[in-house]
Regions:
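Glycine-rich anion-binding loop/nest that anchors nucleotide
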Residues: 72-77, 115-119
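Catalytic or ion-translocation cores adjacent to nucleophile or general acid/base/metal-coordination motifs
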Residues: 3-19, 83-132
Length: 133
């Protein structure tokens, strides 16, 4: 698409997949623990996994923006991260930016009447945000 439309921009690519050996190294070091009442992860589990993908927050997006990225192509992330990252980079309140991002990621489905096919716009201020369809 970029070539066909003759577009030019600085793009960042953020991977979210982990190498199996890295995960096993962290497991042996005791750096991995269960989240909730689930069995401990084993090296066998790691070996059997086809892909190991982590969910990232806004930090990698902010780093990409600080590096001059105009477009970011990323793996799995916490849904509000893409919406909150620019606001956080620019010093806005984390709670407000994340709250607005969480609503925006669901878009107009959060409105009455709800619609998964419509867009929503958010404007963030120092102490509040405004959403509009």
């Amino acid at each position: 698409i970029v070539s066909e439309m003759n577009l030019h921009f600085k793009m960042a690519v953020i991977q979210s997949e982990f190498d199996h050996d890295y995960v096993k190294e962290k497991l042996r070091a005791g750096d991995i623990s269960p989240l909730g009442p689930v069995p401990e992860l084993t090296e066998g589990d790691v070996d059997e996994a086809v892909h190991i993908v982590a969910q990232m927050g806004e930090e990698p997006f902010i780093k990409a923006l600080e590096g001059g990225a105009q477009v970011i192509l990323a793996g799995r992330s916490y849904d509000p991260a893409e919406f909150a990252c620019l606001a956080l980079k620019n010093g806005f309140d984390r709670a407000l930016a994340t709250h607005m991002g969480k609503i925006l990621e669901c878009a107009a489905i959060t409105a009455l009447p709800g619609s998964g096919s419509d867009c929503m716009m958010g404007t963030l201020y120092e102490d509040h945000f405004v959403l509009s369809l």
